[in-house]
Amino acid sequence: MNHIISRRTFLRRASLWAGAAAMGPSIVPSSVLGLDGGVAPSNRIGLGFIGQGGRGQGIAPGFLGAGSQAIAVCDVWSNRADAAKQRLGAARAYTDFRELLARDDIDAVVIATPEHWHVPIAIAAAKAGKDIYCEKSLGTTVAEGRILCDTIKRYGRVFQFGTQQRSEQNFRRACELVRNGRIGKLHTIMITVPGGGTRQLLAPSPPPKELDFDMWLGPAPAIPYVGQALDDRWAGMPDYAVGFLSTWGVHHSDIAQWGHDTELSGPVEIEGKGDYLNVEFCNIANEWRAECTFADGVKLIHYSAGKAPAPLQGDSEGVLFEGSEGSVYVRRGNVLETTPVSLKTSEILPQEIHLYESNNHADNFLDCVRTRRQTISPVEVAQRSTTISLLCDIAMRLGRKVKWDPVTETFPGDDAANRLLSRTMRGPWQV
């Protein structure tokens, strides 16, 4: 961002000086110079928004304020791109993200596309010198996520993952209680998320003229256009996602590993059973129970809501930490419950563990773009949180227990499982 600011500042000041010399004294509004306490336009973070479907539309306004501005938007649906341009006050709308990334007035991008596009676009953005906010899941395979981690490090980019629960006080508080031993020795973590994600598609038909369908498919296999159901229901199709197991599950596996202090590691054994519906293009786990065992013996049990046991029944989502001396339950809606009840107000002392504090996920990203600090949800954590869901899916598809090495990110001596860590990507989008 600094090289853009310095160039713009020079040009702006040169223009002002030239105008003053030619016309004599003039009054420049303080807002233009940033002297009113606001941020001068030349010092604002220039943002590009890639993906303006439901999620993209929902999160975009949160990134815009006095310190940032929308420069350009992109969506493979031209009508969506045009509407987003008007809605966000951007200068240009594109249907090809490469054109957006080529702009030197964009400092950072917000990626909210279907998941099969996350890694290729994020890698291209990093190579183009942009900082990156990327929605979850990180990608569709462990291998592509690792390539992205390496790329972010190589190019020195700021990265924020869309696991916004880390910026909610009740989730941070729950993890601090667990990390500081308030429930004794942790032995079990149970998470539940909504099931579903498998859908029946419509009959093949010509794509609408507003849609660049080949670009929508991108690195995924070429298939016929099967109605807008494809655009609306991609999360239930394994070519584009891993269903709610990951699309939703990443949120709570992230909190589970944050509380367990394994956010940069992972389990060593995984097993489970999923109910897969054998529907063309849509063979995703509809309901599931998967169990991950860590090196310290702690078990993370991942449930769809329909399979959840008594402590979690009735809630469509939540995280339960169980220890030798108590438990902590946390979910959305600012819910935090503890056993014993007194734990809820237990003071975390200055010398104890205090986790990274963020009270607004978008603001944390923008602040880190300015300061070059690490975000609350950096890319390595994104990789490990996503990997939990991918490992559960692999074990369930194989129908057996698998052993995992979180250091090498491989299944030692298991060729069948290792083959599921990557997939063929359609050209020219290989990473």
Which stretches of residues belong to each language-model region?
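Active-site rim elements
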Residues: F161-T163, D239-S246, G274-V279, A305-A308, ...
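A contiguous active-site-proximal alpha/beta segment in oxidoreductase catalytic domains
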Residues: D131, G139-M215
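NAD(P)-dependent dehydrogenases' Rossmann-like dinucleotide-binding region
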Residues: G51, R182-Q200, D212-V226, V268-L277, ...
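N-terminal glycine-/serine-/threonine-rich beta1-alpha1-beta2 phosphate-ribose binding loop
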Residues: M1-C134, A143-V158
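Rossmann-like dinucleotide-binding domain that binds NAD(P)(H)
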Residues: D214-G297
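NAD(P)-dinucleotide binding in Rossmann-like oxidoreductases
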Residues: E280, W288-N359
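Oxidoreductase and adenylate-handling cofactor-binding alpha/beta cores
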Residues: E168-I191, A203-P204, S246-D275, A295, ...
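C-terminal helix-rich "cap/oligomerization" subdomain common to oxidoreductases
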Residues: R13-A40, D367-V431
